[in-house]
Amino acid sequence: MATPLFHADLTVHTQSHDYPIVITENTATENAIAEESSMASQVAPYIAGQQVLIVTNETIAPLYLKALKQPLEVQFTVQVCVLPDGEQYKNQSSINQIYDVLMAAHFNRDVTLIALGGGVIGDMTGFSAASFMRGVNFIQIPTTLLSQVDSSVGGKTGINHPQGKNMIGAFWQPQMVLADMSTLKTLPARELSAGLAEVIKYALIMDADFLTWLEHNLPAMMALNLVILGEAVKRCCEYKADIVAQDERESGVRALLNFGHTFGHVIETHEGYGNWLHGEAVAAGMVQAAELSQKIGWLTSDEVARVKRVLLLANLPITPPPIAVQTALNLMGHDKKVKHGQIRLILLKSLGEAVLTNDFDPDLLTDVLSQHAIHAKDDAQATTATVL
């Protein structure tokens, strides 16, 4: 098998346990199935028992399931659960389907679950692993850019509820993460852009130099230059691994990774799961957070314009859908960062420096929300929906 153009090995350190992130390419090709560097060969050392359940979806299964399943069957008893594709299926019904396969196979605590897919599959597989028999091992094989740079690392797992995104879940760290850059070649352009939103997020909250790097390299990333994409994934995983090592369960600094998410989750919940991709909602949410940062006096208008330009360079939306101000405030009022009844937001002190704060005039938040609001007193969606 040819030497990959890009390869990196990282380690995530947590109080639960340490685990590797392997960033590489071409592990799922037909020629790679029998090779030591194949997808199956990479994950096999992290399977403790003899039982394996691969959880994937209807989009990914035809592309990569054979390359993973066929070699593993030589060593392990392998079952597969193929779920529908989409955020709208990130719910208890899908979790029950995973449980059903585990129970029908008479699998026990020796089982290892493998998430083969994007963030939805990873979140549901991880939550199933956290809850089945009070906890079994699982492995992440993220196949989208968003999941490679963010959701597969750090142990956040869960499902949505009709009244809120990620309302039900657990912190449950994987045994390893295998990010194959080649899987991005089959990713729709819209999904690639959604993943780039999370990449841009890291630059905005942690590293202004990385923002400059992205401004120069986003065209190559959009053109699927795997070496450039691999470098971006590596950097993002390094940023996240560092934060997770400091704050595994999001009691402090890890909250900074939610930049744009409070606004973004309002969009996702209001518009219906799946209508806006997570990264698209986060992109529009980051613009709103930047606009509030400007109103406070932390960012200049030129810096906000720069945020918008880099998002547009990635073909991302910079304007949220029209949502009544009170609806948005109701949704934000149930955010997990709310403390003593006050909304706390991740805002930018400068490009590359973020802070969790409630030190802002509520009228300024209302002003930001009003810029794109439905001008109505009430909205049918202004229920007690919860955003996590």
From Swiss-Prot:
Enzyme Commission numbers on file: 4.2.3.4
InterPro entries reported in the protein's UniProt record: Dehydroquinate_synthase, DHQ_synth_AroB, DHQ_synth_fam, DHQS/DOIS_N, DHQS_C
Gene3D superfamilies attached to this UniProt entry: 3.40.50.1970, Dehydroquinate synthase-like - alpha domain
Alphabetically ordered keywords of this record: Amino-acid biosynthesis, Aromatic amino acid biosynthesis, Cobalt, Cytoplasm, Lyase, Metal-binding, NAD, Nucleotide-binding, Zinc
Entry's Gene Ontology molecular function annotations: 3-dehydroquinate synthase activity; metal ion binding; nucleotide binding
Official protein name in the record: 3-dehydroquinate synthase
Organism: Psychrobacter arcticus (strain DSM 17307 / VKM B-2377 / 273-4)
Textual note on the cofactor: Binds 1 divalent metal cation per subunit. Can use either Co(2+) or Zn(2+).
Pathway stated in the Swiss-Prot or TrEMBL entry: Metabolic intermediate biosynthesis; chorismate biosynthesis; chorismate from D-erythrose 4-phosphate and phosphoenolpyruvate: step 2/7
Primary subcellular site in the record, as a coarse category: cytoplasm
Gene that encodes it: aroB
